[in-house]
Amino acid sequence: VNAVAISSTGIVERARQMHKMLPTATAALGRLLSAASMMGNMQKTEDGSITLQIKGGGPLGTLLAVSDAEGNVRGYVDHPQISLLEKYRGKLDVGAAVGADGMLTVIRDLRMKEPYVGSVALVSGEIAEDITQYFVQSEQIPTACALGVLIDTDQSVRAAGGYLIQLMPGATDDMI
């Protein structure tokens, strides 16, 4: 089993401030930044990078996050001022803001001749489910991914983070 986790509160809060994002955009980009940082850190090349791009057809537009192999990450969202209603009290509707009619594209630049590019159709626009789908479909690695951003009442980031857990080749059912 390969597992990686991140506490990304500081990264996501800094992005919120820099891009002057409203809560729904903060939650969406924060999830993508967390995923990119973990995936960048999982690479086997020290000077490589990974780019995650989501074009979901939702009002946020394109979301992009780029990470190096140390997990240093940056990103943007086309429309940071989008504010959507909550799914229910306390739960932002990130899936509706991102949209589910589009693609997640992952570009792994391992400093070889050509970068590896993999794309999958979005499952939900909630980002963690889409990352899971990417690993299962494009890399054939059974994966569990969870990503979260908790927005405080003053619109700052109270907490952000996530995890990726993957079964490695040869893993038995007992390990699961």
Q: In which residue ranges do the predicted regions lie?
A:
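Interaction interfaces in information-processing and related assembly proteins
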Residues: 1-176
